[in-house]
């Protein structure tokens, strides 16, 4: 039996984009910091890293599609924060953003990591953006790095 897995180390020549929702920026700014920290710690070249800001989580799939279609990037880390409110808006936005991101990744067969928080309240979002529950932005970039390595290994 052969075990095939990715490594948590960049070569330094990977072109990466981080797409970030500005809505709930108090949370997404921290996710962005975590993702950039992970990128640097694991050998990323900051000259090859681009940050792309979008208005909200609903717009993430469209801009992800444009980035992957451009073929300028080896992978994309998608970050956002959708916090439940008093209306069904949360359910619609979180479902469509999630489906759109997954469908776009499969459409282009390119590494994409999902760092979009979907929380019931602001406290849960804060916990996942760098306090008690770690930083999901860091984790999303870590996932992307490993996925890039694994895809490269499987490519041959």
Curated annotation (Swiss-Prot):
GO terms for cellular component: cytosol; riboflavin synthase complex. HAMAP family: Lumazine_synth. This is 6,7-dimethyl-8-ribityllumazine synthase. Its EC number is 2.5.1.78. It comes from the Bacteria. Pathway: Cofactor biosynthesis; riboflavin biosynthesis; riboflavin from 2-hydroxy-3-oxobutyl phosphate and 5-amino-6-(D-ribitylamino)uracil: step 1/2. Belongs to the DMRL synthase family. Keywords: Riboflavin biosynthesis, Transferase. (2S)-2-hydroxy-3-oxobutyl phosphate binds at residues 86-87, 128.
